[in-house]
Amino acid sequence: MKPLNIIFAGTPDFAARHLQALINSHHNVIAVYTQPDRPAGRGKKLTASPVKELAVSHDIPVYQPGSLRKEPAQQELAALNADIMVVVAYGLILPKVVLDTPRLGCINVHGSILPRWRGAAPIQRALWAGDKETGVTIMQMDVGLDTGDMLLKTYLPIEDDDTSATLYEKLAQQGPDALLQALEGLANGTLTAEKQDEALANYAEKLSKEEARLDWSKSATQLWQEVRAFNPWPVSYFEHQGNTIKVWQTQISTTSSNAAPGTIISASKKGIEVATGDGVLTLLSMQLPGKKPLSVADILNARGDWFTPNTRLNNEAQ
């Protein structure tokens, strides 16, 4: 297969994993587009994206326009004369003129099985909804939000102990192989594009800190899914004794209870059992204000008086 001249567009670590795979391949990465350097850390020092750092280390030209809507930036991109543009978590909207510039158009690596979860947070929403599988879709981009024709899909089962952090890592490993496979198929003309079924599409909205508040009137199953979806950010939490307490890990209990939602059923080193709107949820790992995440056994050693049975956990949602 003749090597493709590729423009790569991406910003975070997830994207950098895919850029590394392209660098290691026989294709030519002729330019990298990434978001402008941003202030980061306590000193608010301008910091390059992981994609920029990787590109610079391999002497690949880097472009950082604030927008691709203006003609000078579009002409600059067209002058590169790329065969294809690969987009992975870039963060800028590509207008139609840019999508149509490369000979083979622009393709995107999306962290879900389309059209199930379009949008910014497909990994988190798959967990939040209790999906049994996720995966990676390589898609031909159009002007819509993740609405383009699907070129290739890979599948990944969602395990009971998966969180957004673990799924992110698994998909970051799965995506680059899928991308290289899709590029080979495009170059050889062996890929068949598949239209998305609009009836099956959902929008994966970004998570919010407000959404991470645990509402004990929900079922134990839904709360268990939310805790996994919101790990590592923004982390599920409840309010108790005037403090915000984060919850990092839970499991669904086999205990039955008709106590009011939010009531502590039992508290031991094995976990704190809390009544919900349907079933009982066991809290396994929590984080007190200003402290590191700890096992419930350690939490009870420090603050056992906060979590005595029949105590009702405070929650503004109640």
From Swiss-Prot:
Family per record: Belongs to the Fmt family.
Residues that coordinate or bind (6S)-5,6,7,8-tetrahydrofolate: S112, I113, L114, P115
EC number: 2.1.2.9
Molecular function via GO: methionyl-tRNA formyltransferase activity
Enzyme class of the recorded protein, top EC level: transferase
NCBIfam families cross-referenced by the UniProt entry: fmt (TIGR00460)
Gene Ontology annotations for the cellular component aspect, listed alphabetically: cytosol
InterPro entries in UniProt: Fmt (IPR005794), Formyl_trans_C (IPR005793), Formyl_trans_C_sf (IPR037022), Formyl_transf_N (IPR002376), Formyl_transf_N_sf (IPR036477), Formyl_transferase-like_C_sf (IPR011034), GART_AS (IPR001555), Met-tRNA-FMT_C (IPR044135)
Catalyzed reaction equations: L-methionyl-tRNA(fMet) + (6R)-10-formyltetrahydrofolate = N-formyl-L-methionyl-tRNA(fMet) + (6S)-5,6,7,8-tetrahydrofolate + H(+)
Organismal lineage: Bacteria, Pseudomonadati, Pseudomonadota, Gammaproteobacteria, Alteromonadales
Protein name: Methionyl-tRNA formyltransferase
Keyword Transferase among record annotations: yes
Function: Attaches a formyl group to the free amino group of methionyl-tRNA(fMet). The formyl group appears to play a dual role in the initiator identity of N-formylmethionyl-tRNA by promoting its recognition by IF2 and preventing the misappropriation of this tRNA by the elongation apparatus.
Protein species of origin: Shewanella sp. (strain MR-7)
Source species, domain of life: Bacteria
Keyword tags: Protein biosynthesis, Transferase
Pfam families found in the cross-reference section: Formyl_trans_C, Formyl_trans_N
